[in-house]
Design a protein with these regions (language model features):
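Acidic, low-complexity intrinsically disordered regions
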Residues: 34, 58-60, 126, 204, ...
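A contiguous, well-ordered beta/alpha segment that forms the leading edge of an enzyme domain
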Residues: 2-66
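Exposed regions on extracellular, virion, or secretory-pathway luminal proteins
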Residues: 19-21, 70, 131, 135-139, ...
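Acidic carboxylate diad motif detector
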Residues: 41-152, 295
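Intrinsic disorder/low-complexity detector
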Residues: 21, 70-73, 93, 118, ...
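Positively charged, helix-rich recognition surfaces that bind polyanionic ligands
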Residues: 3-16, 25-29, 155-370
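Short glycine-/small-residue-rich flexible loop motifs, especially phosphate/cofactor-binding loops
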Residues: 36, 73, 302
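Generic structural motif
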Residues: 17-21, 95-97, 116-118, 126, ...
């Protein structure tokens, strides 16, 4: 493990209805920005007429980020390496620093935007409280992004924080096992196992049970010739509604809970945390009903750890290989809450969800290599 730079972001998204004049201004901006994007992408000189139109119709605080390549917020850095978009006119955002002299700023609990005319978006009380807490954590940069989505104005306040982190020498070890068939298991270790917590995503509970029943019923009726296409569509809509909803909120709430606990336990033990994250290989995740939820969890979790400057590392921590001799483990017994694994070579026995902790201790040299 080596010193590295971690970048974390926090985003507050606000939406509001606006009049046609504001939406027309955004669309006009997107046409100009798209022309400059394609000129940059294709390595050709932008049209003088478009540059003149940009100067006349777009204020400088929105304009420089699509024209000046030396601008720190230049939108088109490294676009040559990105996938080529299918659309000619892109939904490019207006971007600027969050400041009273710029295109957007906060005043009296409102986000004030200068979009050809003044636009005020009231920030809900809970969102404003959250934003003030994040601002108190001293982000390095504060920016605002503005774009149109389905006829509504979307504004995102983006806070950015960069931390230089080094691996702690005597850490509070936190092992996060992303399990392709269960969910998330978290171990806290400081010389001994402090606690183990398990988090199961909501889409592994009654929702999937109900969806499977609906799909089985639909397929049986279809095979008997009892369903028209219209009825099949109704069943499909019921299945989608059954599975809709809460995976994103589960990810955010679970990550926030785990990070709060990491910081609290680390403070109580007077140690810096080291978080090792075990992500299953793509083959074990592919086709899993948990795939999207777990990968979203990992991405959001690493982002929040980076925001707080907590050292994390993705590590392969085995659950089917014996940490004592390196042989393959066999399932000895399965209960409602645990799977007991045993090594026929050396006799090692442990709950499967705890085996990654042994490999984490091997990685930081608190246990010998098998």
């Amino acid at each position: 493990l080596q010193q590295k730079v971690e970048e974390g972001f926090r985003v507050l998204t606000l939406m509001t209805e606006v009049d046609k004049e504001v939406l027309d201004f955004i669309k006009q901006y997107q046409v100009i920005a798209s022309h400059l994007y394609w000129a940059k992408r294709l390595g050709i000189k932008p049209s003088d007429a478009v540059l003149r139109r940009a100067k006349e119709s777009i204020k400088s605080y929105w304009r420089w980020h699509i024209i000046d390549e030396k601008d720190p917020m230049y939108l088109f850095k490294g676009i040559e390496k990105t996938p080529r978009p299918h659309s000619i006119i892109l939904n490019l955002p207006l971007v600027d620093a969050l400041h009273e002299s710029k295109g957007g700023f906060i005043k009296d609990g409102k986000l004030i935007l200068r979009l050809n005319k003044k636009v005020e978006i009231k920030i809900p009380e809970r969102a404003l409280e959250w934003l003030n807490k994040r601002l108190a954590e001293n982000p390095d940069r504060k920016t605002v992004r503005v774009f149109e989505r389905r006829g509504r104005l979307v504004a995102q306040i983006i806070l950015h924080k960069e931390n230089i982190v080094i691996p702690p020498s005597n850490p509070l070890l936190v092992v996060v096992d992303i399990n392709s068939s269960y969910g998330v298991v978290v171990h806290y270790w400081d010389g001994k196992l402090i606690k183990t917590e398990k988090y199961k995503p909501p889409n592994r509970g009654m929702k999937w049970h109900s969806a499977r029943k609906l799909m089985k019923l639909r397929d049986n009726l279809y095979n008997q010739g009892c369903l028209t296409q219209e009825k099949i569509n109704i069943y499909s809509a019921l299945i989608r509604r059954t599975l809709s909803g809460s995976s994103r909120s589960w990810v955010q709430q679970t990550v926030d809970k785990i990070v709060r606990r990491i910081r609290r336990i680390a403070k109580r033990h007077k140690k810096d945390p080291l978080v090792l994250i075990d992500i299953p290989n793509d083959e074990s995740l592919r086709g899993s009903v948990l795939q999207r939820t777990l990968l979203s969890f990992v991405k959001y979790f690493e982002n929040i750890l980076s925001w707080y400057g907590i050292y994390w590392d993705e590590s392969r921590l085995y659950s089917k290989i014996c940490p004592q001799c390196g042989s393959e483990l066999d399932l000895e017994m399965r209960t409602k809450n645990a799977r007991i694994m045993v090594c026929k070579n050396c006799g090692f026995k442990e709950e499967r969800d705890k085996i990654p902790l042994y490999w984490a201790l091997i990685k930081i040299k608190l246990l010998p290599n098998p």
